[in-house]
Amino acid sequence: MRRPNGMIAILTGAGISAESGISTFRDQNGLWENHRVEDVCTPAAFLKQPTVVQRFYNERRRALLSPEVKPNASHQALARLQREYKDGQVVIITQNIDDLHERAGSRQVLHMHGELLKVRCTATGRVFESREDVIHGESKCECCGVVETLRPHIVWFNEMPLYMDVIDEVVQNAGLFVAVGTSGNVYPAAGLVMIAKAHGAETLELNLEPSGNCRDFDRSVYGPASVIVPAWADEVLHGKGPAA
């Protein structure tokens, strides 16, 4: 396969952060406080039980900010690739709501499912950084001064992912599309590889195991993200073997 030519679009999923110590918050029965996580992460759930939903995200936010959670070698490798790749842009499209790409030094990151360390005003749509707990009925919005208007800046089930116009443009103009740590089962993210191929891009899957759409990729490499992603980045930057 040919080496990357021009823009590289990289889609990352939960697998890239799995080695960074982020908890899933599910017990052995797949529940959180006797709730299915899928039942907490919906607009209807927020309307019905906002206190419960805020508590769920407060716990996740505190866990993300704990000292033991930090970027791993795969995040660092992608940040280095963004800094050092000379033949075009490297754009990261992530399904993850953590900030580990940014902590590793990446700058061009499109969070299609939102960001855990941000909140959004339901009255104005404005988005704010937030590292503190959000208490329903107490936490006051910065822009409107009203309590009960803040919600997590997260794309819930039945909501449209963010930045899709930009993401489509990036994928359509990429010379190489790479998916790292994705399940291949969540759309529209899982459909991006076929958009890239339709516009002439080479495609590569880097994953712990075959994803749900692994057959859509031209080439696949399997193993821990902290091992295979740095190795691939070295291939791109220093010509050590096939890059795509």
From Swiss-Prot:
Supply the Pfam families for this chain: SIR2
Q: InterPro entries given for it?
A: DHS-like_NAD/FAD-binding_dom (IPR029035), NAD-dep_sirtuin_deacylases (IPR050134), Sirtuin (IPR003000), Sirtuin_cat_small_dom_sf (IPR026591), Sirtuin_class_III (IPR027546), Ssirtuin_cat_dom (IPR026590)
- Function field: NAD-dependent lysine demalonylase, desuccinylase and deglutarylase that specifically removes malonyl, succinyl and glutaryl groups on target proteins. Has weak NAD-dependent protein deacetylase activity; however this activity may not be physiologically relevant in vivo.
| Span of domain Deacetylase sirtuin-type | 1-239
Would the keyword Zinc be found if you checked this record's keyword annotation?
yes
Q: Where does substrate bind?
A: 57, 60
The UniProt record's further free-text remark is: This protein may be expected to contain an N-terminal transit peptide but none has been predicted.
Q: What are the UniProt keywords, alphabetically?
A: Metal-binding, Mitochondrion, NAD, Transferase, Zinc
Gene Ontology terms describing biological process: post-transcriptional regulation of gene expression
Name where it's found: Mitochondrion
Record-linked HAMAP family: Sirtuin_ClassIII
What's the protein here called?
A: NAD-dependent protein deacylase SIR2rp3
Matching entries from PROSITE patterns are given as: SIRTUIN (PS50305)
Entry note: cofactor:
Binds 1 zinc ion per subunit.
Q: What class of enzyme is it?
A: transferase
- Relay the domain remarks: In contrast to class I sirtuins, class III sirtuins have only weak deacetylase activity. Difference in substrate specificity is probably due to a larger hydrophobic pocket with 2 residues (Tyr-57 and Arg-60) that bind to malonylated and succinylated substrates and define the specificity.
Identify the EC number(s): 2.3.1.-
The entry sums up its family as follows:
Belongs to the sirtuin family. Class III subfamily.
Record keyword Mitochondrion present: yes
Lineage, broadest ranks: Eukaryota, Discoba, Euglenozoa, Kinetoplastea, Metakinetoplastina
